[in-house]
Amino acid sequence: FQILLKNGKKKLQIPYELKSRVRRGEDVKGFTSEDVLYLIMPDRFANGNPENDVGDGMREKKVDRADAFARHGGDIQGISSHLDYIADLGVTAIWLNPTQENDMESGSYHGYAITDYYQIDRRFGSNEDFCALVEKAHEKNLEVVMDMIFNHCGSENYLFKDKPSKEWFNYHSNYVQTSFKTASVMDIHASAFEKKIATDGWFTSVMPDFNQRN
């Protein structure tokens, strides 16, 4: 079908394909209390392909295992090559820190400053590499939990740099630090300000907080 965008007398039609599910939603089983999850920070786990340590054209160039805030070179291939080891631990599922693109200047090794929700970070591998990892894990009776972050994104994300309006992000897209005091949300004695700063404040100055009410 066509998506029609209008700006005054200007019109733009964009063809959009709504693809059918490969599997029915009710056939997909999530993790439960029966599972034992093994949390992996991909950049810190194992370097299976040193050639992708510095992604082509990406902002951060530093790879240094002696620097706690730099990239260390771990990737999807490194995880894939250690699946037998992980399975032997007796776990039933792998929980990966976000693997989507984090094209930030520095300090995004953790994966929580996503700049493209549709692309696996090139320093980890490709979208196809990720799918292959999941298939290989399933062959070893391991589930894979994909960590999705929709509370905030990286400031280099196109959704922030080319936002439709400043209301797309909390505090009109201006940096206001969260208090991290989430208990105030349920505290009957907390002020409206305390609750707002806890839920709407930014995680860091380079992780703008999405306005979920928009």
Segments the model singles out, each with a brief description of its role:
Residues 15-20, 40, 187-191:
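A short linear-motif detector with a strong N-terminal bias
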